[in-house]
Amino acid sequence: AYDRKTKEVFIPNEEIREEFIRSVKNGNRRELVKAVELSDKLLNATIRKDEATVAELIEEAHAANTSPKFYNNEQALRSVIIMAYLSSVDDYCRFEELASGKGYIDLLFLPTKQSAKPALVIELKWNKSGEKAIRQEEEQQYWKFAETFRYKGPILLVGINYNTKTKKHTCRIKEARKELL
């Protein structure tokens, strides 16, 4: 995560933070490089609207960064997704549980003024569907954050679902309709 006031980056999930510190202290940066490469792929797949690749990469990150004891935990998934989008720090400001429209956006990646990338509105679901997440984003008018931030660029609505029985992730990505903006 990035604290705009202090201009510092931090990792909010304790398990991930400890693993990051261990990796850096031991000089073993191969895992860190792999995490950044996965993050680059994930961000690019999201922007390309490659739903299958996004679901696959999130599943990979979830398996690699969550202990079996906490695998079926919503907060663990949220932390994994935040960490998986690590590469976003170069082009985005991240917001969590941001009030917008008639509800709260789980995760918003708002591009910096220098970035030409689209805004990413991410809704997480548990034992539902990516389609249901997208429907919620539309019905709750999450795209209204654009008014608050005076953002006029493209917006991608991203719905990520995790099924606890199958341990599978699914993803739906849709451009917000221009007439809504």
Model-assigned labels for residue ranges:
Residues 1-135, 139-141, 167-181:
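Extended alpha-helical interface modules used as scaffolds for assembling large macromolecular complexes
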Residues 92, 153-155:
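A structural micro-motif
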Residues 120-122, 156-160:
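Hydrophobic/aromatic beta-strand patches that form the interior of the parallel beta-sheet core
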Residues 143-152:
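Arginine/glycine-rich "motif VI" loop of SF2 helicases in the C-terminal RecA-like domain
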Residues 160-168:
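Short, conserved secondary-structure transition motifs
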